Amino acid sequence: MFKLKDATMIYDMDKEDKVYAMREINLTLPDKGLIGIIGPSGSGKSTLMYTMSTLKNLTSGEIYYNDILLGKLSDAKRQELRRKEFGFVFQRHYLVPYMSALENVMLAADGSRKSCEEKAKKLLLDIGLKQKEIGKKPGKLSGGQRQRVAIARAMMNDPKVLFADEPTASLDHDNAYLVMDRMKEYAKERLVIVITHDVSIIKNADVMVEIWDGDIAKITDRRDESFGGTK
């Protein structure tokens, strides 16, 4: 579970006109489900993801993950937390150019090569790649295909939290919906946090958090169980 208390991020602290990427955000997220963080460019939604995942530090306020105060962790402990608990899908794919799609996914693998290869193939097929594309290198794949490889790689080690920043940006609508359906299924036992400006692709989210100008404008909860979020 994540809990944010007065979480604030300010850029250009040394300037007279400071930029508030996040303004005293208070938010509680559960330990599983599909969460959509929605807002226009510059609204602060990506900054929210980066601070929750320990990739950036807050200016003030607190973020807890399973009762651990993230701001108190050393750099080494943060790296360990990201490696063991978190998975990431970024807007840039960061695939190894001389490795095949399958090999790129297996980079994140723990376990025997045979079992990991079978799992990696299944993930790639489930996310929409064709059998003939699995052995291709990134340079031979389209932007959308590379994006799906990155998503499969992020899922490879079954992270407890999957952070996805605009994961369908390179996909057409049909493939975007396929990927989001897969993420919805994946979120039954894990927490999946999707950052997007496109409300249509996150319509099946359990919870939608709308961010405007660094603040929470609205929270929509489609689940029966309790969920907390306050400004």
Protein language model features and the residues they cover:
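Conserved ABC ATPase signature
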Residues: 137-141, 145-147
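Catalytic Walker B motif of ABC-type/P-loop ATPase nucleotide-binding domains
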Residues: 162-165
